[in-house]
Amino acid sequence: MSALLEATGLTRRYGHVTALDDVSVHLAAGERVAVVGESGSGKSTLARLLLALDTPDAGTVALDGRPVRPGSARSTRWFRRRVQTVPQDPGRSFNPRMRVGDAVAEPLACLRVHGDHSARVAELLVAVGLEPDAARRWPHEFSGGQRQRLAIARALAPRPDVLVADEPVSALDVVVRLQVVELLAQLSAAEGLALLVVSHDLGVVQHLCDRVLVLDAGRVVEQGPVGEVFGAPAHPVTARLLDAVPTLAAVVS
């Protein structure tokens, strides 16, 4: 499969600390790829670079072969229309003074998509398992799991090709995590949406992703199909992650 979103040789340093060291990753249309690793391995740094929210010291990020770097809202608008993100903490990602319908439609306004977005908002709310009249309510009226569904709806508003999710369920309880993971899988299949999921929870990865990259100290130490990597880990970091408590696997089993 040809790459839709591709990063080549990404390196990012903060002072004397190398957070990411010559990392390459590609994502094809409709593919679901996970980036896993222990705390401080460089996962979130990679996500920020792939979202053009930070500038690498070396390497490139390209969408359909077109390079992208951080810049003004106008210069990156083409990229933002096609690549969106789901936040780690949905509670902090919504303006408490903005009704949910306006919040879900906010990316469309920011990306200069003109018109009445009420029909699109209603469609998105139904797609994530909420009622259309939720648009009139306020963020604080929803549970954590419902707010994450709203965050997913907001990310889908401009009909992106790629969704980057950095620890998308870590702030949720175990049962709600499974519900949100299943929702992401369903939406990815229905929309042909490519997913890049950053997670330390291998249960999430096993249920959602096709392929996995394992990071350690800013480098890719192992990668391949999820079943192969998790079935016979070749690196000690992967083995340690697999030995950790599998939050979702425990629920499913």
Residue ranges of model-derived segments:
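Helix-to-loop junction immediately C-terminal to a conserved catalytic motif
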Residues: 51
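Conserved ABC transporter NBD signature motif
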Residues: 59-70
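ABC ATPase NBD coupling module
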Residues: 68-84, 98, 102, 110, ...
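Conserved ABC ATPase "signature" region
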Residues: 116-133, 242-243
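Conserved ABC ATPase signature
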Residues: 138-142, 146
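ABC ATPase "signature
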Residues: 223-224
